[in-house]
């Protein structure tokens, strides 16, 4: 038994590795013929296999060698965390400008460094592009287009201001011209009524008419004219056309009716004609006109009343409220006032 153990121990490590490695290699070759889901559906590596292949391809194409520029070497020395402190300080002192040197040289050095150093956010590293620095130059530095862009709004403002001034002047002149025109045209008033005997003055000539026409077109539409000019003067004298009998009727209707009945027969007797032909013709005309108002099938004779003398008919007309029957409304009102 001891000899067998020694023979097992006498096998080299390489032979053992070859024996154990042949089995799994053959198994992998066999599994490659099947689909991915058939191999191991619960394996997480199946889902990330494509991403791993993309990362491997990027790493294979990535250039790990730094640039050959001396500036990059200096920057990498300062950024290297394994470098010594003295070396980093010496590199910073080399980058800083000397006291005797000018500021422009230092600025040019920093600009050249910024232009030559590779951007860590470059697209080839898989990052987003960096933002650009804002321009510090003046807005109206060179081209004439900027001047034109500034002049156009200035012109618009000037035109608007001029238009407002012209409108204000025209409105003020029109306001002043209205009383000047009507001072010569309007005559004197007495109790807000024009006097017929008076005539307008001679100042209202053709020149003033032309002036009025020219000013009337310049008036803006939105402005309303004064009410005193728009209303004619004869409207103020309408009170003289109102008869005083209306006031008496509203005050005491019974007395006014009696006065009207007493005064009416005298006027009729003075105005009635002597000829009977005219009266008969007028009566026949009234009968025909009244018969026309009725329908054709009805008998109009029953509506006709016997003829009476003209004077009696005319004298009975003023007493229109004497023999009339009172309505229910009048009786109810009278009873309510009496109680």
From Swiss-Prot:
UniProt keyword terms in alphabetical order: Mitochondrion, Phosphoprotein, Stress response
Compositional bias per record (Polar residues), positions renumbered to this chain: 99-115, 198-213
Region (Disordered): 1-20, 94-130, 198-224, 258-325
Localisation per UniProt entry: Mitochondrion
UniProt entry tagged with the keyword Metal-binding: no
Residues with the Phosphoserine modification: 177, 224, 227
Matching InterPro entries: Mbr1
Modified residues (Phosphothreonine): 159
Residues spanning the membrane: none
Cross-referenced Pfam families: MBR1
Low complexity bias locations: 214-224, 279-293, 302-314
Keyword Mitochondrion belongs to the record: yes
GO cellular component: mitochondrion
Chief location bin: mitochondrion
Coiled coil: none
Functional summary from the UniProt entry: Participates in mitochondrial biogenesis and stress response.
Assigned protein family: Belongs to the ISF1/MBR1 family.
Name of the featured protein: Mitochondrial biogenesis regulation protein 1
Species of origin: Saccharomyces cerevisiae (strain YJM789)
Native organism taxonomy: Eukaryota, Fungi, Dikarya, Ascomycota, Saccharomycotina
């Amino acid at each position: 038994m001891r000899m067998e153990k020694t023979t097992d121990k006498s096998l080299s490590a390489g032979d053992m590795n070859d024996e154990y490695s042949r089995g799994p290699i053959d198994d992998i070759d066999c599994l490659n013929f099947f689909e991915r889901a058939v191999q191991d559906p619960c394996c997480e590596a199946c889902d990330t296999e494509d991403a791993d292949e993309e990362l491997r391809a990027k790493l294979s194409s990535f250039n790990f060698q730094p640039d050959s520029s001396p500036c990059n070497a200096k920057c990498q020395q300062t950024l290297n965390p394994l470098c010594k402190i003295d070396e980093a300080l010496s590199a910073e002192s080399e980058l800083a400008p000397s006291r005797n040197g000018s500021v422009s040289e230092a600025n040019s050095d920093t600009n050249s460094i910024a232009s030559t150093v590779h951007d860590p956010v470059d697209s080839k590293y898989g990052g987003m592009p960096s933002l650009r620095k804002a321009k510090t130059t003046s807005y109206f530095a060179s081209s004439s287009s900027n001047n034109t862009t500034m002049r156009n709004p200035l012109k618009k403002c000037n035109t608007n201001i001029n238009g407002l001034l012209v409108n204000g002047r025209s409105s003020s002149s029109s306001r002043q011209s209205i009383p000047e025109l009507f001072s010569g045209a309007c005559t004197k008033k007495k109790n807000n009524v024009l006097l017929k005997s008076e005539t307008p003055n001679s100042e209202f000539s053709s020149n003033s008419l032309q002036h009025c026409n020219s000013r009337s077109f310049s008036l803006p539409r939105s402005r309303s004219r004064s009410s005193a000019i728009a209303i004619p003067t004869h409207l103020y004298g309408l009170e003289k056309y109102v008869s005083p009998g209306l006031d008496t009727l509203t005050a005491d209707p019974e007395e006014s009716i009696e006065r009207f009945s007493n005064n009416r027969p005298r006027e009729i007797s003075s105005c009635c004609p002597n000829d009977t032909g005219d009266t008969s013709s007028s009566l026949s005309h009234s009968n025909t006109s009244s018969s026309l108002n009725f329908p054709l099938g009805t008998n109009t004779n029953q509506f006709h009343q016997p003829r009476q003398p003209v004077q009696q008919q005319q004298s009975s007309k003023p007493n229109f409220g004497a023999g009339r029957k009172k309505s229910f409304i009048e009786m109810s009102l009278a009873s309510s006032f009496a109680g």
